[in-house]
Amino acid sequence: MSNPENAQDAMLGNEPAVEPVVEPTAEQHTDTLPSIEEQFRALELKAAEHYDAWLRAKAEGENIRRRAQDDISKAHKFAVEKFAGELLAVKDSLEAALAVQEQTVDSFKSGVELTLKQLVSAFDKNALNEVNPAGEKFDPHKHQAIGMVDSEQEANTVVTVLQKGYMIADRVLRPALVMVAKGK
């Protein structure tokens, strides 16, 4: 059954106002919404923009990689430049010593000593350190044992250094060639 209030409204002719539902026409739809073709074109443009941006980013990445490789190559090529500059003074001293016509043993010896000081100075400036382990405990990372000898020293102690070793910073350039004490 119906509601009594609705019945009264119906008798009095007071019907509730109902708005008619109006369906939009096809023309109204096309005015407010873009067509599929327009949407497709817009998406194609956006895709082209993204593709272009991707290509640019890829090219920039390649350029950065190439520049980094060039920098590394130059660093390798010119890494010894400072050290080589230091060695030029040593070479000049040796050439000057050889150019002297009348040399005595003492003058020759003092010239060689000065040249050795220049070389040691160049080594020091470039973190090239001498390893002279006489009397130290044998370290296989810095020393190369040539043989073992009887000695009064403790076992595995360096007794004789046959050839000094060298290190650049903390890396062994050449291990010291040593003779090591045998166990007692």
UniProtKB/Swiss-Prot annotation:
A single Gene Ontology CC term: cytosol
The keyword Cytoplasm belongs to this UniProt entry's keyword annotation: yes
The entry's keywords: Chaperone, Cytoplasm, Stress response
GO molecular function annotation: adenyl-nucleotide exchange factor activity; protein homodimerization activity; protein-folding chaperone binding; unfolded protein binding
Keyword match Ribonucleoprotein: no
Biological process per Gene Ontology, one example term: protein folding
InterPro entries the record matches: GrpE, GrpE_coiled_coil, GrpE_head
Predominant location: cytoplasm
Cited Pfam families: GrpE
Gene3D superfamilies per record: 3.90.20.20, Head domain of nucleotide exchange factor GrpE
Subcellular location: Cytoplasm
Summary of subunit composition and partner proteins: Homodimer.
Family recorded in the similarity comment: Belongs to the GrpE family.
Function: Participates actively in the response to hyperosmotic and heat shock by preventing the aggregation of stress-denatured proteins, in association with DnaK and GrpE. It is the nucleotide exchange factor for DnaK and may function as a thermosensor. Unfolded proteins bind initially to DnaJ; upon interaction with the DnaJ-bound protein, DnaK hydrolyzes its bound ATP, resulting in the formation of a stable complex. GrpE releases ADP from DnaK; ATP binding to DnaK triggers the release of the substrate protein, thus completing the reaction cycle.
HAMAP family for the chain: GrpE
Name of the molecule in the record: Protein GrpE
Native organism: Dechloromonas aromatica (strain RCB)
Gene: grpE
